[in-house]
């Protein structure tokens, strides 16, 4: 799907947006996190519900997630891979969070993330978010302790 010419520019623009979402997550700023999310963005997250739709739902989900932490937390994006054309792009990565929840539980978790983008009115916007963790087929439980 890569095209000649603006591919490098598109990839660098997407990379900057992903880095900005990581910074916004570390700052626990839901509005900054969703600044480049399309109004009708659809999300598949690692927690319930099965899906959510709309940037307002993303803001609400982010605020819930941020409020579940005891202070700040570490948030990193690893192995970011971007594929982009002039009007659509997607990226995937392994993301890592480390911190303490408000209930005192220590969290050191990795998950898989995919973001899909469309260029809307000359601006890259996130149109789909997918986060997942593998699960153990024998127990049916999420594999939250797995590391790359």
Regions found by a protein language model. Give the residues of each.
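Short, cysteine-centered beta-strand-loop-beta hairpins and adjacent loop/turn segments enriched
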Residues: 98-107
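Short helix-adjacent coil turns
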Residues: 21, 25-29
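A solvent-exposed, acidic/Ser-Thr-rich amphipathic alpha-helical stretch
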Residues: 8-12, 16-17, 30-85, 94
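Hydrophobic/aromatic beta-strand elements that line small-molecule binding cavities or substrate pockets
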Residues: 21, 77-82, 95-97, 112-118, ...
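Short beta-strand edge/turn micro-motifs at domain boundaries
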Residues: 110-140
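Basic/polar N-terminal segments that are highly enriched at the extreme N-terminus
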Residues: 1-12, 146-148
